[in-house]
């Protein structure tokens, strides 16, 4: 049975304690399986880096608007919800020291009794890397080393690690995650490097595609499975999940093969095609800039389509 989640209002004018809590609690009541928080630490006033996750290729949140911290938001929601999974989509690993953010993530997993999904990525905005004094060109290697260290932190008692970027000498790291044997790692990113990272370290490949067909998504996942096999892993240990933008319309819209736009019925039909190729979990980002209208779409989709989609079997 496939699962469905929605993105949280962690940025923009709507970002507040009350809307964040209401959005998560309402998603839980409506039957969504997960809520997702995006990650941004600073917002440069001038961004030349191409944004890969919008049709216009420009970042969608102005720099003078709030953007809450993803880890803090999920820690807050651990105490405001009971069942829904709490996900990062995705946390940029090179911005933070792995001992620090792993401690926070493990604490959230304990406080939520095992509901955290650790969505991780290497980042894309060179200007933000510069502000954080983080190595943009080495972000992939830094991220891989962090993921290697995490495995030690969550499974060993006397931890020693000597890497190119991080060194640890005989430390303890407790508590361990609530989930066993460790937190689920969902590796974001769309290209071959991300696919290899998911195959080596991930419990899921978790790309965000603005435009994608189920067939193309499956092609990418088959790359992940092949890479997993070459590393000696069982390919079945890595599942397929993804985030997809959604534009709901009041009436049927002309079909667009690579984009989820149309009536609730049209979007649900397209999502069934993603289930058919084996997508286990889909995070839906409803592309409405104003929060009240966005929440209305989240409610309408849940009432008119979600139960049948969750029950649909490929």
Q: Can you say where each PLM-predicted feature lies in the sequence?
A:
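Active-site-adjacent structural elements that line small-molecule/cofactor binding pockets in enzymes
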Residues: 1-314
